[in-house]
Amino acid sequence: MISINNFINGEFVPPNSNQYLDVYEPATGLIYSNVADSNSNDIENAYQSAQSAFKFWSGISVEERAGYLNKIADGIESRLDEFAEYESRDTGKPISLAKSVDIPRAVSNFRFFAEFGLSFQFESELNSDQSQNKLIRSPLGVVGCISPWNLPLYLFTWKIAPALIAGNTVVAKPSEITPYTAFKLSEICRDAGFPVGVLNIIHGQGRTSGNALVCHRGIKAISFTGGTATGKLITKKTASSFKKLSLEMGGKNPAVIFADCDYDNMLETMVRSSFSNQGQICLCSSRILVEEPIYEKFKIDFVQGVSELKIGDPSKEGTQFGALSSKGHYEKVLSYMEIAKQEGGKVLVGGNQIKINGRCETGWFVEPTIIEGLNNSCRTNQEEIFGPIVTLQSIQSEYEAIQLANETEYGLSATIWTEDKEKANRISSQIDAGIIWVNCWLVRDLRTPFGGMKQSGMGREGGDEALRFFTEPKNICTTQ
């Protein structure tokens, strides 16, 4: 059994407490590793390492930093299948998904920001008859990056890459539930000759090491992806220190389907957008609003499509639907299935746990579940479940679609299905969500801003927005 240690100053270091947490394989429910249970002393050591490396890292050119990021990308890509196996084992997601999405996206994150940093305006000028103004965007210093368990390497690198290309040094904390690919990223950094101290990876629980990172006075910014409740705690804990915050949090995303849509494309995409990664993506559709003329047809076809998903061992190439990522989350999802039934919901398909024969017999599997007949104000339609449970509602008009879509405290994403471009534009402009997909889902141009409205987030990631977040502007004004 491998013990996952912290990565500080280019070396693997056991936690100050000498305590470790069990790491489980969701597909079997069995322990396969353990990970450092770090505390504030480990965070302090990582901070000191990052602080010592900051002068060097911020002092080299963007081109040099880009070269280092590309080396990391090359290292991950050269071991893509290996990383995919680790990600699948850690999370319970199908290995085909890890191979086609998670690990390639991690590679893309480093390569994108390596290239994007070369064109970003870290220096510019604004001149007039009265003055010359030199505008400089400088790195903040040591920053903290906290990533979730559902897309471990995908979102870990999404935060680290822009922080690094901007010239910051980083103390990063992955989820203790799914730490393995972050650990392997440490190996890539070491083997690629990445400058010591520039990236430090600390493992452990949110209430201990995560809290210490958030509260550390030397950390200039926190980039966080996770639940809204945790995001609120981070906001409170950092209020007095005025840290910069980027918070990407929960969602309860509507999909609005009109009768004039490209039906076949919509149907195939809705199965994927509802149940990809077992519904454990913040952008998954969870409230499906269908125009009345096609509601019954869609219901029948959607249930059929979901019923055909291949559920099973995530390590098998043919599996389309794997295990939930932790026992606690498995129990939470099962509890919401019961809540939906108690609220009067009619289960069209699913609604139960699953026993998989063979090595996965004790794994954390539930059925993909579709429910209709619920009021929009009920808990099932208002609270983020973050699992394979979706609800169906019939709509009569654009007005009703917009009203129901916005009737939630979240505002992360939405999808709209119609061949009428004017209708799509009308509705998009009135739905409160940070990203809206029209006739598609999860299509991402990494130059565009990403983040949510309302309780779904604060700040934006991606492209210019990410590099603005990880830099501080300064104006140097000289008179003629």
How should these model regions be labeled?
Residues 29, 65, 87, 110, ...:
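Residue-level signal for inorganic ion chemistry
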Residues 122-265, 395:
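Rossmann-like NAD(P) dinucleotide-binding subdomain of oxidoreductase/dehydrogenase enzymes
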Residues 32-120, 130:
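Glycine-rich loop-to-alpha-helix module at the N-terminal edge of alpha/beta enzyme cores
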Residues 221, 229-375, 438:
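ALDH superfamily catalytic-core signature
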Residues 1-27:
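Hydrophobic face of amphipathic alpha-helices that form TPR/SEL1-like repeat modules
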Residues 32-38, 53-59, 145, 255-258, ...:
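Short, well-ordered beta-strand elements within core beta-sheets of diverse protein domains
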Residues 28-34, 219, 256, 310, ...:
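Conserved C-terminal structural/oligomerization subdomain of aldehyde/semialdehyde dehydrogenase
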Residues 54, 58, 73-80, 84, ...:
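Structural signal for hydrophobic packing residues in well-ordered secondary-structure cores
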